[in-house]
């Protein structure tokens, strides 16, 4: 989140995640999928979309309903699934990604592209090091250019190739 105070951009220094779902509908559905939980916070990484979604669901208030929706869609496509028993795992400020969870569970095509699209992934990172090449910002159309002291077009934002969801805070 960017705020302007006294004419200067400031951030609240937290995790930033760009959820990138390939738009190409040419995907191969597997016979099975494995879901595990993990810790998704400030680290710069490209992480597994299925396990990111599963971790978000397990940390939500109505996890049983959401898991049943997920299972029903996978059953419809004859995809077997294994869910690792929850021991630990979180998404930093995961409630900020509630719109992503709702969107994929209410749109079968979007969910399947999210889980099985070869180019789909979640880029994690943080806003403490706002460099143009940090992929955690790719869901943003613009990015702060410290050298030019202004927002510029984000070279990593490719709306023709991806549906994006942004988890800030």
Range-by-range predicted roles:
Residues 1-10, 15-169:
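Long, non-globular targeting/processing and low-complexity regions
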């Amino acid at each position: 989140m960017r705020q302007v105070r006294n004419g200067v951009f400031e951030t609240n220094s937290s995790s930033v995640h760009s959820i990138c779902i390939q738009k190409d509908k040419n995907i191969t559905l597997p016979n099975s999928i494995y879901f595990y939980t993990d810790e998704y916070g400030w680290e710069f990484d490209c992480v597994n979309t299925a396990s990111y979604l599963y971790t978000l669901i397990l940390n939500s208030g109505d996890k049983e309903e959401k898991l049943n929706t997920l299972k029903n869609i996978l059953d419809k496509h004859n995809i077997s699934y294994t869910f690792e028993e929850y021991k630990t795992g979180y998404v930093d400020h995961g409630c900020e990604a509630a719109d992503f969870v709702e969107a994929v569970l209410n749109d079968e095509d979007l969910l399947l592209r999210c889980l099985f699209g070869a180019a789909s992934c979640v880029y994690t990172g943080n806003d403490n090091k706002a460099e143009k090449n940090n992929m955690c910002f790719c869901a943003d159309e613009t990015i702060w250019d410290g050298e030019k002291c202004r927002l510029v077009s984000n070279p990593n934002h490719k709306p023709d190739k991806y549906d994006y969801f942004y988890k800030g805070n």
